[in-house]
Regions:
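Short, low-complexity, polar/charged sequence segments that are solvent-exposed and flexible
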Residues: 23, 44-48, 80-82
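A short, N-terminal amphipathic alpha-helix
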Residues: 39-55
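Short beta-strand-loop/turn "lid" adjacent to the catalytic site in phosphate-handling enzymes
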Residues: 50-98
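Short, well-ordered alpha-helices that flank and scaffold nucleotide-derived cofactor binding pockets
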Residues: 18, 45, 75, 79
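Short glycine-rich, Thr/Ser-proximal phosphate-binding strand/loop in the N-terminal lobe
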Residues: 2-43
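Residue-level preference for the first positions of well-ordered beta-strands
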Residues: 1-2, 59
Length: 98
């Protein structure tokens, strides 16, 4: 499974995908005052509420338009899953021209 995060100016959209299918999703407000730990707790609660096992995740991917929150949310996801959270951007080697 993959944890996908889309961090926008107003909302953080979170989705869980298994074999190209959306398993579950939710939305919460983007809040620059929240810490990485607070975002980790939000993500943890979402996964627990949906009975998802952390060991089944291959990692996380984050897209963000808020530079000041990108690191916090990426750290929250990687700490929770104990796996890398890739951040989409011009430095990520994905085989596509951006």
């Amino acid at each position: 499974m993959l944890l996908l995060l889309d961090l926008g100016n107003t909302n953080l959209f979170v989705g869980v995908y298994r074999k190209r299918s959306l398993v579950c999703s939710f939305r919460t407000y983007s809040d620059k005052t929240k810490s990485s730990f607070e975002y980790q707790e939000i993500l943890s609660q979402f996964l627990k509420n949906n009975n998802l096992d952390l060991d089944q995740f291959e990692g996380a991917i984050l897209s963000s338009v808020i530079p000041s929150l990108t690191r916090k949310v990426a750290l929250a996801a990687s700490s929770l899953l104990n796996k890398e959270c890739k951040v989409l951007g011009n430095q990520l080697k994905c085989g596509l021209s951006i």
